[in-house]
């Protein structure tokens, strides 16, 4: 992923957050002084890894990206990890990291069009579907769903989760008439400024379920309400959209836009909603982490910056890369571009921790959201960690994209919960092949590395 991006004006959407640049400076956190002699971050090791995926013709152009963890309430040992593989479709794994089901991405609609490309995935629990006509049941069924952004077609894809289903737990229940998320037509889809990042959210007040989708190479985020149809499928409607800024006023009074390929804006990918108060956290890859109401009605606040924030860059057409200039020192100290996967770790005492993948330096940062604090309070940095090799054949996570965490007992393998992280450079790999995959980490190791286990014991 290119570390710097250029900006050009985007089409207006329902909510715009591109007001006076000076306002952005006030909303962003003050630059932190570099830490001298800081201790190395603690390391945790994975317990298991999935088989490598290969982004080439032989491997079906499969490229690991984003995971989600589904807990089987009847048999936690049979819980599942559902993960995107881009043009390779969806993969479903057991807790042993072995493949349970593989679903292909949809084919290209025409010879000159892009095929389906599953980018990000998240879960919805207990959505009520229409009555099942195949069984003549009059009662509506509730179902857990895996919702995916299909970047290739600019649509959401929705799969029902049923662990007892012969042939695999996932069934596609996407309404064939489901609309495109951002694009007006196929020509616009082919430009690939399409649905990209994803987070799901069920409003506790109304009971309605939503997906929030970001737009590739743009700053837009769309709120989409998930709607069951009479035929038992699921569609969605766009409620509103919001545009994050693409240009920023720095503390020295100068303006800055992240450098990137011509015509591209600084995009968002990693997103997660805290269901306790309906707060959306969104990672603008080359900028930092934003906080905003998940209904997209309020003003976004930049709560942490990437280290590269404010660094000027010049795009080189020959190399197709950005050459960075002198660092003015306005960036943060916790995450390096790209800021990628975001996940929420809830504790038993009600505290919540936002985990962020710092792709630029192969680390993960944790931010505390304390019980009883106002929603407007910024998350507080609580530590970080690395996922490193457990052995010569079980490597760690590098250039991590997506991540998912579940702090609930998952049977005998993960009684203290599970963290799943993407590995952007799975090794060992055959020479000349790009290998990716997912690492499964015992959550107790992560909580110990962050000091959460000791804090929980002290509170008891």
State what each model feature region is.
Residues 1-33:
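Secretory targeting and sorting signals
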Residues 4, 33-460:
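Sequence/structural signature of beta-propeller domains
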């Amino acid at each position: 992923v290119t570390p710097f991006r250029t900006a050009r004006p985007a089409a207006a959407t329902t909510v715009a957050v591109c007001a006076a640049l000076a306002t952005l400076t006030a909303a962003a956190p003050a630059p932190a002084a570099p830490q001298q002699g800081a201790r190395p971050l603690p390391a945790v090791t994975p317990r298991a890894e999935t088989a490598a995926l290969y982004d080439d013709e032989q491997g079906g152009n499969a490229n690991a990206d984003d995971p989600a963890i589904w807990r089987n309430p009847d048999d936690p040992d049979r819980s599942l990890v559902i993960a995107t593989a881009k043009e390779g479709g969806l993969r479903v794994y057991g807790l042993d990291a072995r493949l349970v089901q593989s679903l292909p991405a949809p084919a290209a609609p025409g010879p000159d069009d892009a095929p389906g490309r599953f980018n990000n995935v998240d879960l919805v629990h207990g959505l009520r579907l229409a009555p099942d006509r195949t069984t003549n049941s009059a009662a509506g069924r509730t179902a857990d769903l895996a919702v995916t952004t299909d970047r290739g077609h600019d649509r959401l894809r929705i799969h029902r989760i049923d662990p007892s289903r012969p042939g695999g737990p996932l069934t596609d229940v996407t309404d064939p008439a489901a609309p495109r998320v951002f694009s007006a037509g196929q020509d616009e889809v082919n430009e690939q400024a399409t649905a990209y990042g994803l987070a799901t959210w069920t409003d506790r007040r109304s009971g309605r379920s939503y997906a929030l989708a970001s737009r590739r190479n743009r700053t837009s985020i769309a709120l989409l309400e998930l709607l069951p149809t009479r035929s038992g499928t699921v569609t969605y409607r766009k409620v509103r959209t919001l545009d994050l800024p693409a240009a920023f006023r720095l503390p020295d009074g100068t303006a800055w836009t992240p450098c990137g390929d011509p015509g591209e804006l600084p995009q968002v990918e990693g997103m997660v909603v805290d269901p306790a108060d309906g707060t959306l956290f969104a990672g603008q890859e080359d900028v930092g982490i934003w906080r905003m109401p998940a209904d997209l009605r309020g003003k976004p606040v930049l709560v942490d910056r990437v280290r590269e924030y404010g660094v000027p860059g010049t795009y080189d057409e020959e190399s197709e890369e950005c050459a960075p200039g002198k660092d003015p020192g306005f960036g943060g100290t916790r995450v390096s571009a790209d800021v990628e996967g975001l996940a929420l770790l809830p504790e038993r005492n009600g505290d919540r921790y936002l985990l962020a993948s710092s792709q630029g330096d192969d680390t993960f940062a944790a931010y505390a959201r304390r019980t009883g604090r106002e929603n407007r309070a910024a998350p507080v940095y609580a530590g970080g960690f690395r996922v490193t090799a457990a052995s010569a054949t079980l490597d760690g996570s590098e250039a991590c994209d997506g991540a998912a965490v579940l702090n609930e007992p998952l049977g005998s393998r993960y009684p203290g919960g599970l963290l799943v992280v993407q590995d952007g450079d799975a090794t060992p790999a055959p020479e000349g092949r790009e290998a990716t995959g997912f690492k499964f980490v015992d959550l107790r190791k992560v909580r110990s590395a962050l000091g959460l286990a000791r804090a929980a014991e002290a509170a008891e």
